[in-house]
Amino acid sequence: MQNQGIKKIVLAYSGGLDTSAIIPWLKENYGGCEVVAFVADIGQERSDLEGVEQKALQSGASECHVVDLREEFIRDYVYPVLQTGALYEGSYLLGTSMARPIIAKAQVELALKVGADAVCHGATGKGNDQVRFETTYTALAPHLKVVAPWREWNLRSREALLDYLKERNIPTTASLEKIYSRDENAWHISTEGGVLESPWNAPNKDCWVWTVDPQEAPDQPEQVTITVEKGCVVAVNGEALSPYKCLETLNVLGAKHGVGRIDIVENRLVGIKSRGCYETPGGTIMVAALRGVEQLVLDRDSFKWREQLGLEMSYVVYDGRWFAPLRRSLQASAEALAEEVNGEVVLQLYKGQVTAIQKKSANSLYSEEFATFGEDEVYDHSHAGGFIRLFSLSSRIRALNEIKNK
């Protein structure tokens, strides 16, 4: 394997089995290069970060940098996507997809700071993440070389990885038994593999690790008031909070009531279908709040355009094109639409369901006077006939032509 002149590599490091093995592998296969470990704190389980620096150094890294990206992740990545209403294939709230560009960006920033020649990730050759990481690298620092061990090495099993570390006397807490593959951040937890590999198998209870089983959730519903400004959640139950703190608060409430579970089969960018169980408790509550205000504020054409924005944005984000001009254009349009998306929504949480039971906005286009079925001074029922005749004119002309040509 050629060194390609690489002297220093910054690795996106998680502390897991794969990236722990990547550190010595890089040093052995890239001419004894220096490996700097980069750990992104995006709200994953705190225990995943305990001792991660020591673990990286024991694996052979020269340095380990743990960077707190939690607030930036929610403020600059999650909230902008929420403004567009993006849902990949109608249900996936893009938890992993949104996290990859901020990780890769911070990794590139560290690489430039320490004078690295290359960046490295631990994504497999079958998944979407390799595309998301490398597209970001290319957009931000095209001169950096990219190393993707899963496309090069012959370590194809957990057993092989464990043996590799054992042979080099590198300690690890990993074991042979790893039933599921999981990704976790402040926004969501995804679970894949194991029993989920067959779409005919119902998820086991251990497929869900964050949210309470809706059937076992509290028997009494709970209400929460969400304040929205410019399409962003800014307060929970009247308390103004930062984006990350808003999400953190709603995650606790949502998980308690079994909110935010989905079990889907999705189309990966690389052409493979995959199944996953996703848990997004706080995010699901936020989406419900935003929809509640949008229903009051956006007119029909604006709402339709926001739906189209969300559809396009879902593919852009899923495909890892965060730093593409198209994403910025979609975002600018969404921000313009969100200017008047201000208001309050009271949501009821009950056994996995989120229901908007009260909503108000100073910019509301809803008028009780117009909405009534009774008589009023501003809407003349007789006007509807002319509108319908014009609205259906093309259908009328087509029908007349068909009769004429019979």
From Swiss-Prot:
Major site of localization recorded for this protein: cytoplasm
Gene Ontology molecular function terms on file: argininosuccinate synthase activity; ATP binding
Keyword annotations of the record: Amino-acid biosynthesis, Arginine biosynthesis, ATP-binding, Cytoplasm, Ligase, Nucleotide-binding
Keyword ATP-binding: yes
UniProt-annotated binding residues for ATP: 12-20, 40, 122
Entry's EC annotation: 6.3.4.5
Binding site for L-aspartate: 124, 128-129
CC per GO annotation: cytoplasm
Gene Ontology biological process terms in this record: argininosuccinate metabolic process; L-arginine biosynthetic process; urea cycle
Domain of life: Bacteria
Enzyme class: ligase
Coiled-coil regions listed in the entry: none
UniProt-listed PANTHER family: ARGININOSUCCINATE SYNTHASE (PTHR11587:SF2)
Protein name, UniProt field: Argininosuccinate synthase
Source organism of this protein record: Serratia proteamaculans (strain 568)
Gene designation per UniProt: argG
